[in-house]
Amino acid sequence: MALHLGVITLLPEIIQGIHYGVTGRAIEQGLVKIDCWNPRDWSSRPYKQVDDKPYGGGPGMVMMYEPLHAAIKHARSEMKENCKTIYLSPQGKVVRQNDLKQIAAQKQSLLFVAGRYEGIDERIISHHVDEEWSLGDFVLSGGELAAMVFIDAIIRLIPGSLGHLGSAEQDSFMNGLLDCPHYTRPATINGLDVPDVLLGGNHKEIERWRRKQSLGKTWLKRPDLLEKVQLSETDKQLLAEFKCEHGDSC
C-alpha cells in the first residue's frame, strides 16, 4: 500500500516539484501518494481571503482558523485513519535523521500544514496539529519548501525508492556520522587521483577506508556529532589514524 502524504498549502504549484527525480519515481512506482488541499477552497470571505490582521496589533497577517480547520478536516477524511498532522515552523523541534527514520518506520499517513504570512492562528496548532517540526534556526517565506524537504527525506527511507538498497544506509547521519567521500571515472583528471584503495578491489580494505573517512570527515566538519556516537575500539583507532594523517598529534 502506498504511503499517503498530504500538504495543506496556499501554493500547491510549488509542491509539484516533488514529482521529479527520486521522489517522482517513487510516486510513479506506487510507493507513495501525494495530495494537496488549498485552504482558499474553504474560504467564505470575498476573493477567497484566508488571512487577517493579528489581534493585539503588529506587522503582517495571520492565516485564519476557519479555512485552515476546514481544509485539515477534509484532508484527514480523505487520508482516512492513522493520519498524523505536522505543522512546519521555526518554533518546532529541529528534525534529525533519526527522527525521520522513526517517522518513516511508523508507515503512517502524514499531513503537512504549510503556513504563510506571519504564521497561522495558534488555535490550529494547539488543537489540530499532532507535531511541530523545524528544519533549523532560520525562517522561510512559507512552509511549502520545508514540507518538500521533509517529504523527500521520508521517501528516501521507503524500501524500493532508491536505485540501490544500500544508498539510504550510506547517507550522512544515518549512523550518526557524515558520509564518506565518493569518486567516479576517470581515475585521474587535472592531476587529481582517486585514492588507490578504491581501485584495488579489496572490499575489506575499501570498507575500512570508508569508515575511517566517515569518522574523519565528521571530526573535521561536525565534531559535535562524535559526542553523540558510541565509537568502538576499531573506530577510535581509525579516527586516530585519520587525525595523524591530517597533521594532528599522533
Swiss-Prot record:
Domain of life: Bacteria
Subcellular localization: Cytoplasm
One Gene Ontology molecular-function label: tRNA (guanine(37)-N1)-methyltransferase activity
Catalytic activity: guanosine(37) in tRNA + S-adenosyl-L-methionine = N(1)-methylguanosine(37) in tRNA + S-adenosyl-L-homocysteine + H(+)
Enzyme class: transferase
GO CC terms of this entry: cytosol
EC code(s) of this entry: 2.1.1.228
Residues the entry annotates as binding S-adenosyl-L-methionine: 115, 135-140
Gene3D superfamilies: 3.40.1280.10, tRNA(m1g37)methyltransferase, domain 2 (1.10.1270.20)
Entry function: Specifically methylates guanosine-37 in various tRNAs.
Subunit structure, as described in the record: Homodimer.
Protein name per UniProt: tRNA (guanine-N(1)-)-methyltransferase
Organism: Legionella pneumophila subsp. pneumophila (strain Philadelphia 1 / ATCC 33152 / DSM 7513)
